[in-house]
Amino acid sequence: MERRTLTFVEACQHLGNMYGIKWDEKEPTPEELAARFEREQLFRANDFAAEFFRDQYKLSEAAQKYAQERWSDAIIEEWGIGYAPHKNALLRHAKDKKANIDDLIKAGLIKVSGEDGHYYDAFIGRLMFPIRNRTGNLVGFSGRIINPKKNAEGREPAKYINTSETPIFKKGETLFGYFEAQRIAARRDLLNIVEGQPDVIRLASIDQQNTVAPMGTALTSKQIDLVKKIVSKVVLIGDNDPAGQTAIVDH
């Protein structure tokens, strides 16, 4: 039996087309149109940043060294892995290209200082993993620090940070790799759930494309609902250390 990963509305439209039933979609309200327009703006902002991060990856020896020690060049390109450099490079690039800074702020890519209102990049010195929703739209990023340096207070930056929550990205409703995994997972009726983005990509490179990861938190009910839409069997794979085993138990 063939499975399709469709939303309810998409499923109704698909069945209507199959059996010649006319599907009358109601006119959207002004509020719905405004929300749809905002979502499209955020998708475009993420696409703009993703292209920049990919270009910067090709210019960074440190980013390439880190990534190539873990994955092949083909896998790096397939997953759109990029690099966010220092010195507010994305902000400067956006100004040079006359991109909409407000959209980049709304997308969580540019931050505004609460002290003096100056703008700065949300991701600095990080390998960038694009995050897609179930239909393939780019909704955010997860950034992995590659050369951690302690701040003035002696603390190292977080190993991973994700895009802050936006109208198109909710951490507790998103699984990294879900878009890439859903068709193969549905066909195999099996989904691997691992701890982090590198684990997803590593397993996908050895024919385990049916692999996802939560966004740094324990699995939520909405993430579990996503899993149940496509499979009935799940394998939980933790890192081979006490913290990893505990994380999987929490999940």
Locate the predicted segments by residue.
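Phosphate/diphosphate-binding loops
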Residues: 240-250
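Short beta-alpha connecting loops at secondary-structure transitions
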Residues: 235-239
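Non-catalytic accessory segments of DNA primases and related replication-initiation nucleases
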Residues: 1-107, 111, 126, 138, ...
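Phosphate-handling DNA/RNA-contact segment within nucleic-acid enzymes
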Residues: 31-37, 44-46, 87-234, 247-248
